[in-house]
Structure formats: C-alpha cells, structure tokens
C-alpha cells in the first residue's frame, strides 16, 4: 500500500502544478481584459487627467502590470485599447507560457469627437 502511494505522489504533484499554472493563466487573461477596458474608457473621456495606458496599468495588480504592454488609439467616435500580458510561469526552467491579449472599444464623448 505504501509503495503504491509513493508512486502516485509525483503524479499528484504534477497535477497540482498544472492546475495552479492554469489558474495563473486565467488570471492573466482576466487582468488583460480589465486593463483594456480601463484604458479604453479613460481614452474615451473628453477631458481626462490621466492617459489610457496609465489607467490600464492602475487597474491591474502590480505584479501583472509589470508584465503588461498596453496600446491605445482613437478613431472617429471611439477609443480602442489593447492589453498584452505575459503569462508568468511557476514551473522552474519553463519561462514562456505565451501572452494573453484582450482588446476593448468604447464610444467617445460627444465633445471629443471630431
């Protein structure tokens, strides 16, 4: 009985690590969406004290904001923001789990449209 348990422990540890890594990846996607919405919303205001990129970073947790790349742009009647977040790895020696990317588009204020 004890021998079977010892053989099964590494499998349980790998499943636990995979589950935690999947949770971190889902959190990165959520943070990218939050940053994109906040950045687009800020860029859509006619008079704003902050820029969209700063608002996007402020909406994220600090350790994810350090890994983020946020771009904002304005079009006719709309503001668009895209946030890309590098997915961190908890597995030693494995450094790249890709990036999470989310975009958001918000209508601009009437006063700010050309």
Describe every region a protein language model picked out.
Residues 1-55:
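Alpha-helical assembly-interface signal, strongest on the long, hydrophobic N-terminal helix that forms
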Residues 45, 49-114:
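Short, conserved structural patches
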């Amino acid at each position: 009985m004890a021998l079977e348990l010892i053989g099964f422990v590494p499998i349980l540890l790998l499943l636990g690590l995979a589950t935690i890594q999947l949770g971190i990846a889902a959190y990165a996607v959520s943070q990218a969406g939050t940053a994109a919405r906040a950045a687009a919303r800020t860029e859509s205001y006619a008079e704003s004290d902050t820029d969209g990129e700063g608002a996007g970073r402020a909406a994220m947790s600090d350790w994810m904001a350090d890994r983020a790349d946020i771009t904002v742009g304005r079009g006719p009647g709309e503001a668009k923001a895209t946030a890309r977040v590098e997915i961190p790895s908890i597995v030693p020696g494995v450094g790249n789990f890709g990036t999470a990317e989310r975009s958001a588009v918000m209508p601009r204020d009437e006063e700010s449209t050309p």
